[in-house]
């Protein structure tokens, strides 16, 4: 969803064929225990390791020509000079943001003011999904473990639209 938001594409999990294709490719890789970096993801968008999506044939749902166009968009994102910075540095890891190596709690302040709108949506969605993944790995407790504070949330959790950041925000609000 965040990659599609970065590309400025619709990320609806039920209607966006790009989302459905990516979800199926990622699901198969995860189930098989296979690592999938962006170059391999792009290759599998062009030539998915499956013939059907749901009960329909892959070519009916997402023809080869359209998959190639989508793969080119992903490749252009990867090849863009500004995207190189996203591939460097310390990986996003909620446990490292919340705790020191010795296990002491810490405060992490993340500023995204310098990013464009699509990059902000990408980062916020990635951060929220990583936080949800971390949260689901924690055993139950009656004490507070973490606080997420975000200023100017309106664009990420609007009342009517459904941007990529909204589903993970709603998941966190339910916890």
Residue ranges and their predicted role:
Residues 1-174:
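P-loop NTPase motor domains
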């Amino acid at each position: 969803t965040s990659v599609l938001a970065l590309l400025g594409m619709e990320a609806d999990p039920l209607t966006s064929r790009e989302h459905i294709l990516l979800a199926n490719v990622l699901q198969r890789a995860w189930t098989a225990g296979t690592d999938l970096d962006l170059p391999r993801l792009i290759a599998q968008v062009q030539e998915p390791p499956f013939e059907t999506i749901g009960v329909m044939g892959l070519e009916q749902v997402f023809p080869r020509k359209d998959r190639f166009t989508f793969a080119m968009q992903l490749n252009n994102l990867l090849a863009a000079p500004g995207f190189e910075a996203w591939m460097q540095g310390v990986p996003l890891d909620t446990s490292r943001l919340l705790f020191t190596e010795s296990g002491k709690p810490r405060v992490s302040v993340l500023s995204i003011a310098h990013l464009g709108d699509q990059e902000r949506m990408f980062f916020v969605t990635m951060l929220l999904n990583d936080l949800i993944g971390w949260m689901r790995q924690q055993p139950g407790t009656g004490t507070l473990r973490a606080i997420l504070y975000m200023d100017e949330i309106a664009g990420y959790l609007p009342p009517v639209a459904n941007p990529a950041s909204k589903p993970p925000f709603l998941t966190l609000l339910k916890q």
